[in-house]
């Protein structure tokens, strides 16, 4: 056995570094510190400049490296090394990924980095290694950094204390909403879509003119997101209003497409723009899989003919299919329609995380711009005061030029002599001594007084501005107008007119009311089939009718569970013991040549959940649902249709599970419990509900509900014994009682399994 490894003996001070505390408290404190670090230093953007620390550090490092738009690009590896060595104590991969994202036109609405080389593409291909690519800042990045060297923002020590970095950038435009952001922290996440910067600035101007403007007013200026990849936003205005009011919601977007005639009555669909953050290669693969799996019944072929622009060609299976119907079916099945989640979770000026609506975010940005304005003004004021002080000294020197020149030439300590003779300060004396004699002799009183007067006028203007909040807000608006004009010069091939009058990428539209399902069903040949579902959950569909079920073959240890006659155009409903309904298209079921396929591969059904009933959907029919706890209700069959693989929760079963799902065929309902007691009551006493728990059907001291039977009072009740023989029940009225009663014991000769029909 290996000997345990012990720590080396420590010195006399080691006891000071050993903490004796409960493990839970130590873990809790450290995890909290980690969570706060992740939230504040990595995952969430600042509401003022819209940047996470890594993006801010990349831009600041590039600014220090003088990688301005008019400069030559430098290797990205050089930038990453600068960021990692001086500001960001993390891996180079995360820094390079952040830099690459800032340069991608399909990721950023306004790219902040100009990349040269392979920076990835909309297909999802990665960027080239950092040693091969080069970068520099864009004009938009310069707008974010404008004033960084004029004390516009606070600085803090870097991680090693060797340098300083900005806490936030001056941010000339509302970058948070302009470029959006996404990130996952501990216990919270953020997801912000990009917007049109010109529209955002117009909204800011509206808030400057009317701080009481509502979110609805702001939506007149910012009607919705503006995604870099274009596309069509089909989210309703009411939904967008709620999203921007609360800061939470989502935006539904679709691919932009057009119809191209190919002659002889045929056509093809060409997709020119796809939803934001959808990888084109994955989309093509998804559409191809839909064709192979026969889920896209109207689509015949898909081709990617993209070059610099996106061009996905979709060929319909039949020329008789309407283009709108084809696209609606694909929107339902593929990423041609996507939903971008919105969660404007950001750090405020104090570093506190919180969810903001669009008005709160813009107001925080405007407050930041005002602070930047006043800080730059005070910085300029200090510069002016210093220059005026020097000009006063130079004016004294000019008025006494001969004496000043004599002192400078012949005195051993000219500085002390100047101060003593003319009453100058150290700064004024140094300024005179630092001026060459030739320049000192060329000083002109008019020039000094002119510069002095200009600076005094500028100083008075700054002081007046600092004393007036109204003037400050006015200058903020003027600055935003200048930034707006600069941003509008940035053009892109996808730019189109927007509702606000400016150009943008995304447009707005409405999803047409097209019944794609009906069109798909119309193309399915209507044929009779028999659905076979085994006890272990293997499903298949046989053509025609099965006369002798005993001839069916199953896997070893398996046997018949359900035998359901249907048609290929039917929707198959599956009811599970956890109260959920699942829907499968009968035309998509595997053939009966083999044993079929596990139904759990087609629907999300847990292994512990049992299938209670299987039947084809029929419009206008009603079902009786009941749980083993003895509760139930009446439900229209339309409420059972589910569009998701996870199904639709309809019956709240609690811990007991579902008991039965009966077709409502008469006016009476008979229920039997595990205790062998039967209760019959009118079906009209059951409420009709789309979902829920229902009302009490029968009372039990022990056990629960076992089975039920719906029948017509005129034809009478019955049961089917274990041999499959029908037994009419003439005395059924003796078991009639009030709903929720206990009932009476079963009649003589009743089925031994205490069920109205064999399970």
UniProtKB/Swiss-Prot annotation:
GO biological process: chromosome segregation; DNA topological change
Record-annotated active site: 132
Domain Topo IIA-type catalytic: 44-516
Annotated positions for site Transition state stabilizer: 131
Known EC number: 5.6.2.2
Keyword hit for DNA-binding: yes
GO molecular function, one term: DNA binding
Main location: membrane
Role this protein plays: Topoisomerase IV is essential for chromosome segregation. It relaxes supercoiled DNA. Performs the decatenation events required during the replication of a circular DNA molecule.
Name of the protein described by the UniProt record: DNA topoisomerase 4 subunit A
Gene field: parC
């Amino acid at each position: 056995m290996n000997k345990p490894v012990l720590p080396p003996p420590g010195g006399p001070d080691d006891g000071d570094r050993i903490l004796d505390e409960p493990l839970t408290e130590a873990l809790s404190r450290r995890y909290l510190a980690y969570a706060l670090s992740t939230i504040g230093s990595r995952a969430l953007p600042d509401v003022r400049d819209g940047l996470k620390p890594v993006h801010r550090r990349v831009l600041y490092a590039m600014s220090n490296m003088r990688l301005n738009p008019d400069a030559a690009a430098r290797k990205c590896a050089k930038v990453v090394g600068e960021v990692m060595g001086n500001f960001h104590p993390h891996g180079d991969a995360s820094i390079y990924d952040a830099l690459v994202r800032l340069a991608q036109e399909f990721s950023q609405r306004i790219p902040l980095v100009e990349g040269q080389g392979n920076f990835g593409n909309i297909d999802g291909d990665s960027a080239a290694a950092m040693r091969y690519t080069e970068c520099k800042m864009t004009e938009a990045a310069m707008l974010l950094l404008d004033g960084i060297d004029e004390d516009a923002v606070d600085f803090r020590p870097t991680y090693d204390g060797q340098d300083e970095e900005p806490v936030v950038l001056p941010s000339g435009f509302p970058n948070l909403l302009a470029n959006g952001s996404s990130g996952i922290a501990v216990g919270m996440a953020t997801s912000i879509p990009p917007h049109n910067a010109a529209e955002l600035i117009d909204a800011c101007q509206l808030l400057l003119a009317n701080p009481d403007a509502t979110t609805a007013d702001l939506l007149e200026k910012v009607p919705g997101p503006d995604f870099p990849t274009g596309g069509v936003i089909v989210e309703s205005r009411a939904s967008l209003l709620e999203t921007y009011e609360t800061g939470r919601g989502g935006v539904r977007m679709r691919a932009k497409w057009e119809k191209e005639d190919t002659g002889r009555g045929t056509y093809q669909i060409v997709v020119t723009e796809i939803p934001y953050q959808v990888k084109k290669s994955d989309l093509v693969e998804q559409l191809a899989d839909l064709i192979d799996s026969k889920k896209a019944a109207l689509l015949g072929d898909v081709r990617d003919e993209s070059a610099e622009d996106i061009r996905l060609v979709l060929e319909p299976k039949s020329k008789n299919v309407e283009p709108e119907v084809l696209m609606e079916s694909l929107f339902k099945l593929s990423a041609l329609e996507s939903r971008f989640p919105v969660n404007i979770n950001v750090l405020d000026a104090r570093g506190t995380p919180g969810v903001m609506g669009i008005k709160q975010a813009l107001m925080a940005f405007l407050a930041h711009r005002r602070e930047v304005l006043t800080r730059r003004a005070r910085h300029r004021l200090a510069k002016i005061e210093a220059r005026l002080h020097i000009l006063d000294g130079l004016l004294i020197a000019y008025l006494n030029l001969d004496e000043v020149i004599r002192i400078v030439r012949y005195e051993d300590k000219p500085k002390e002599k100047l101060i003593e003779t003319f009453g100058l300060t150290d700064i004024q004396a140094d300024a005179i001594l630092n001026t060459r004699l030739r320049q000192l002799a060329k000083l002109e009183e008019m020039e000094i007084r002119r510069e002095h007067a200009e600076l005094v006028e500028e100083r008075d203007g700054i002081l007046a501005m600092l004393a007036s909040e109204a003037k400050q807000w006015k200058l903020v608006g003027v600055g935003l107008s200048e930034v707006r004009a600069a941003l509008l010069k940035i053009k892109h091939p996808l730019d189109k007119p927007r509702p606000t009058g400016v150009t943008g990428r995304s447009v707005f539209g409405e999803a047409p009311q097209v019944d794609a399902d009906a069109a798909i069903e119309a193309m399915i040949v209507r044929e009779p089939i028999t659905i076979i579902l085994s006890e272990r959950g293997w499903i298949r569909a046989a053509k025609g009718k099965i006369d002798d079920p005993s001839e069916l073959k199953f896997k070893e240890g398996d046997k018949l569970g359900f035998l359901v006659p249907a048609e290929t155009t039917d929707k198959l409903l599956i009811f599970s013991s956890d109260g959920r309904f699942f829907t499968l298209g009968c035309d998509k079921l595997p053939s009966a040549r083999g044993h079929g396929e596990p139904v759990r591969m087609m629907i999300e059904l847990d292994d512990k959940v049992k299938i209670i009933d299987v039947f084809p959907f029929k419009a206008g029919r009603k079902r009786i649902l009941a749980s083993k706890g003895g509760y139930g209700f009446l439900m229209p069959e339309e409420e059972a249709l589910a569009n998701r693989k996870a199904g639709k929760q309809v019956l709240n079963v609690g811990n007991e599970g579902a008991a039965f799902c009966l077709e409502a065929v008469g006016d009476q309902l008979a229920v039997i419990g595990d205790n062998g007691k039967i209760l019959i009551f009118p079906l009209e006493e059951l409420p009709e509900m789309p979902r829920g728990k229902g009302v009490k059907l029968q009372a039990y001291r022990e056990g629960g509900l076992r089975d039920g039977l719906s029948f017509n009072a005129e034809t009478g009740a019955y049961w089917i014994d274990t041999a499959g023989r029908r037994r009419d029940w003439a005395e059924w009225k003796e078991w009639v009682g009030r709903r929720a009663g206990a009932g009476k014991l079963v009649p003589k000769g009743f089925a031994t399994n205490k069920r109205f029909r064999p399970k």
